[in-house]
């Protein structure tokens, strides 16, 4: 089934998704014909617990959250997926069943790959499989570090860390989310998030308009943040995704 608004496969497909951009040429040529660019809508659910995974999404623009949920507590964010990553990780582990909810928080676009095709390609290419498994390790590191941060670090650092990671994953300084969404994903009260962001605004580190936060001084935001953001970035650097990021930025400047 094709998503409404899906675009036709271009003959020469390039992508800002850094996981795909970091692939060797042979593996990119292997996977490229099977990818289809589709829009991502806000609140679109890409995976639901205890249901079969239908597609793998390589996010190009936008932001999705990985959430654990209970009936009593609702959703709690355990990870973010943006231009550095992909969904459908169960397929890499030999299962088609989702265990966590993945939903779009900032709309954008993705390259979509059918689940059966993804499984076949991972089986055919050891390099694709290793890349996917390395990404799973990076996402596990992110989830573990976020759990530690949410449990042990003050609200000031948690909000700063969330904004920095969201900015990295989006690739732009404007993070169009509400205070309520950040609060929901952090598992805290909205007022606590609003207080911290208003402090940042008063210091000139961020500016705000309705449901959008713009990072004005990233260096200042990083200077008074816990080390969790740096540790998560270090794991993605190990995958050479930050090298792909710099190459993409240089290519954009040359155009």
Give the label of every model feature segment.
Residues 44-106:
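Cyclic nucleotide-binding regulatory domains
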């Amino acid at each position: 089934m094709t998503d409404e608004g899906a675009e036709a496969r271009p003959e020469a497909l390039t992508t800002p998704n850094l996981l795909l951009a970091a692939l060797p040429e042979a593996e990119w040529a292997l996977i490229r014909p099977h990818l289809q660019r589709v829009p991502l809508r806000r609140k679109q659910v890409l995976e639901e617990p205890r249901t079969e995974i239908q597609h793998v999404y390589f996010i190009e623009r936008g932001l999705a959250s990985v959430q654990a949920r209970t009936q009593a507590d609702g959703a709690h964010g355990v990870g973010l997926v943006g231009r550095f990553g992909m969904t459908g990780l169960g397929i890499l582990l030999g299962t088609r069943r989702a265990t966590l909810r993945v939903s779009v928080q900032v709309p954008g676009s993705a390259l979509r790959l059918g689940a059966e095709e993804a499984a076949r390609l991972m089986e055919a290419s050891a390099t694709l499989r290793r890349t996917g498994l390395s990404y799973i390790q990076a996402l596990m590191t992110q989830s573990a570090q976020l759990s530690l941060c949410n449990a042990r670090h003050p609200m000031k650092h948690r909000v700063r860390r969330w904004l920095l990671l969201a900015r990295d994953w989006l690739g732009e300084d404007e993070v169009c989310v509400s205070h309520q969404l950040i609060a929901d994903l952090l598992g805290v009260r909205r007022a606590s998030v609003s207080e911290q962001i208003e402090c940042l605004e008063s210091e000139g580190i961020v500016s705000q308009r309705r449901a959008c936060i713009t990072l004005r001084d990233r260096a200042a935001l990083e200077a008074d943040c816990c080390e969790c953001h740096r540790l998560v970035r270090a794991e993605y650097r190990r995958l050479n995704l930050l090298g792909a990021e710099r190459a993409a930025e240089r290519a954009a400047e040359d155009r």
